């Protein structure tokens, strides 16, 4: 039997540079990654450094609501 809510939840990470700059003129789109986080260990919003194929560099990807 499961004990209460699951600790691991899926989260979406979105490129903050693409959102701020309104996406590059050459390509349209916003980089998004799907990952998991442990709700008990990281109650705050998750931010990771990931590669953005639209910016062509590593940028900060922040957690967004579904």
From Swiss-Prot:
Q: What are the subcellular locations of this protein? A: Plastid, Chloroplast
Q: Which PROSITE patterns match?
A: RIBOSOMAL_L33 (PS00582)
Q: Which GO terms describe its cellular component?
A: chloroplast; ribonucleoprotein complex; ribosome
Please provide the record's keywords in A-Z order: Chloroplast, Plastid, Ribonucleoprotein, Ribosomal protein
Q: Does the keyword Ribosomal protein apply?
A: yes
Domain of life the protein comes from: Eukaryota
Molecular function (GO) terms listed? structural constituent of ribosome
GO biological-process terms attached to the record:
translation
Matching InterPro entries: Ribosomal_bL33, Ribosomal_bL33_CS, Ribosomal_bL33_sf, Ribosomal_zn-bd
Q: Which family does the similarity line name?
A: Belongs to the bacterial ribosomal protein bL33 family.
Please name the HAMAP family in this protein's record. Ribosomal_bL33
Cross-referenced NCBIfam families? PRK00504.1, PRK00595.1, rpmG_bact
Which PANTHER family does this entry report, sorted A to Z?
Answer: 50S RIBOSOMAL PROTEIN L33, CHLOROPLASTIC (PTHR43168), LARGE RIBOSOMAL SUBUNIT PROTEIN BL33C (PTHR43168:SF2)
The name this protein goes by in its record: Large ribosomal subunit protein bL33c
Annotated source species: Helianthus annuus (Common sunflower)
